[in-house]
Amino acid sequence: MIGRLRGVLTSKTPPWLVVDVCGVGYELEVPMSTFYELPNVGYEVNLFTHYTQKDDSAALYGFLSESERRLFRHLQRVSGIGTKIALAVLSSVSVDTFAGLIQAGDVNALTVIPGIGKKTAERMLVELRDRAADFNNGISTSGKLNLDTVSEAALALQQLGYKPAEAARMARDAGTESDDVASVIKKALQAALR
């Protein structure tokens, strides 16, 4: 259907966007990880898209990378996971981190993601383990990020006034596998000041 859009960003209200392509405004829903990486209104954007139609409604979803869109599609093939949980996954962790969690079989880390309980996490592991390489080429599990540390850092950033999705993105981007909560918070705040 519609595989990619390139146009001017005319509206931006989480998690919705409107992209003007030759005078036609396309409304898209995007994961928060994509939302916070977008330029300001009035600038050109290039998004990979996924179109869905169910009964009497249609929706268009946008992603900054092909790997995000691939993961979104793979997640929806898992029994019991729809677009809402797929977007929550992409809003919470990067494709690399998610692929590493699947390959490592880390149920506990997956349950930190909003909307994913233990049964859903176990089902994801079973159904996605063989396909992890499909949604991300060159996955490395050695640099596994501790999601408990990231979650705690994100909560602390929220207490400092950051919105939940922005705090999660900041903590995720700042953390490395050897960081403790204080280090992640410090790095996230330093990055925000740049």
From Swiss-Prot:
Residues 145-194 are annotated as: Domain III. Residues 140-144 are annotated as: Flexible linker. Residues 1-64 are annotated as: Domain I. It holds the Pfam family RuvA_N. Belongs to the RuvA family. Homotetramer. Forms an RuvA(8)-RuvB(12)-Holliday junction (HJ) complex. HJ DNA is sandwiched between 2 RuvA tetramers; dsDNA enters through RuvA and exits via RuvB. An RuvB hexamer assembles on each DNA strand where it exits the tetramer. Each RuvB hexamer is contacted by two RuvA subunits (via domain III) on 2 adjacent RuvB subunits; this complex drives branch migration. In the full resolvosome a probable DNA-RuvA(4)-RuvB(12)-RuvC(2) complex forms which resolves the HJ. Has three domains with a flexible linker between the domains II and III and assumes an 'L' shape. Domain III is highly mobile and contacts RuvB. The RuvA-RuvB-RuvC complex processes Holliday junction (HJ) DNA during genetic recombination and DNA repair, while the RuvA-RuvB complex plays an important role in the rescue of blocked DNA replication forks via replication fork reversal (RFR). RuvA specifically binds to HJ cruciform DNA, conferring on it an open structure. The RuvB hexamer acts as an ATP-dependent pump, pulling dsDNA into and through the RuvAB complex. HJ branch migration allows RuvC to scan DNA until it finds its consensus sequence, where it cleaves and resolves the cruciform DNA. This is Holliday junction branch migration complex subunit RuvA. The gene is ruvA.
